[in-house]
Amino acid sequence: MYSAPSACTCLCLHFLLLCFQVQVLAAEENVDFRIHVENQTRARDDVSRKQLRLYQLYSRTSGKHIQVLGRRISARGEDGDKYAQLLVETDTFGSQVRIKGKETEFYLCMNRKGKLVGKPDGTSKECVFIEKVLENNYTALMSAKYSGWYVGFTKKGRPRKGPKTRENQQDVHFMKRYPKGQAELQKPFKYTTVTKRSRRIRPTHPG
């Protein structure tokens, strides 16, 4: 004879089913959130206020700084070199940036062949890079248009083509540095201590 399941067994089954559904929903939310963040990082943001910063990018391999020499790009600039001073504009909600040489006003770009070039107009997506902060505290710059292609240089400061670069290569690792004599001009954020307003006591007048 088939015996009906007890009330306790039914409750246990319902509980297990509920736990399973919660885990599935949580997994879906995590995936959706990761996709949302990735999409926002790659998308243009015309709402947020753009930030413009001035600094140099020190190449780990060449031991020098990236230079924007008009249409030519190299990593042979000394500390404080006028062609190594870069204006970096934060472009999106995520970490997309446009990099312009302060002296030449040409933008650092990567063309469809993976070659680093300077362009006077930086509106093209070829001139947008995704900034990645690595575990070793270096920064890597991946092309926003050509995913997986990075800004990189040889030991002699010559540009590497995008298809030959990888995130874990030292050739694509850079360190942000303020131009010589400019570090002291960068003011840190100041926090203001807010005290509670004391209650104003009105003077009493004799009746």
UniProtKB/Swiss-Prot annotation:
Protein name per Swiss-Prot or TrEMBL: Fibroblast growth factor 18
GO biological process, one term: signal transduction
Cystines in this chain: C109-C127
Annotated keywords: Disulfide bond, Glycoprotein, Growth factor, Secreted, Signal
Cell location: Secreted
Main localization (coarse): secreted
Keyword Cell division included in the entry's annotation: no
Signal peptide coordinates: 1-27
Sample GO molecular function, one term: type 1 fibroblast growth factor receptor binding
